[in-house]
Amino acid sequence: PPGAVKIMQDPSIFVGEGLPVAFSSISFLFYFLPLFFIIYYLIPARAKNVVLLAGSLFFYAWGEPRWILLLLASILVTWLLGRAMRPEASAGRRRGLLILGLVFQLGLLVAVKYAGFFFGAFIDLPKLHLPLGVSFYTFHAISYLVDVYRQKTPPQKNLLRLGLYLALFPKLVMGPIVPYHELEPALAQRTIDAQDVSDGCFRFTIGLAKKALLADALAGLVTGIWGDLASLTVLSAWLGLIGYALQLYFDFSGYSDMAIGLGRM
């Protein structure tokens, strides 16, 4: 089908390649990352969350300026609903607030992902691409609200920390989705460890090599094969399918390694 062929010709749509500050981009590697870490390591511990959130929002706004308000709205509404679900509130009130949060978060997700599908035949909607990372920060928000509702964790009083949980740039665009109660201790207090920084740099470099040396090389092969369907043979079709599968694997694996490395650093 034409859609499948388009994806095979450009599978990078799955891995955030439209973002000007993608982890493998020149802008990220030589401008954003060095400047961010210099500031982050030099400032006092009490200000690190401020810099980390500001850097994460800048990272997202650089790539998605038109959708930054949606991310900020998700952070604010999630924080307010969590605060309202305090332990002394009645079970019915807590349940109602959870349902309200689920409707809000999933409603936003459905609106931006499927509005064109449902209403495009009736009204002329502007053609906007999907906000990068919307699924990930939406489900992170839901994870937080569910944890508060189940009393696995108290409501987060600090808006900065909750914003950091939803918008932390290493996991903002491609995940992974980490339950709030697992990440909560690190939001409150972290220590910089030389071994963590070293291991993080190594893991990031491995991921970058997977992306730049393997995935991108395979992308050229796949594009060449699926870009000329008229001369496609059984052998070249199989080669294209295998190359495409390997490209996706190294794209996702490389991105995951880079995200883990950034987190360690």
Report the location of each language-model feature:
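Membrane-embedded transmembrane alpha-helical bundles that form the catalytic cores
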Residues: 6-265
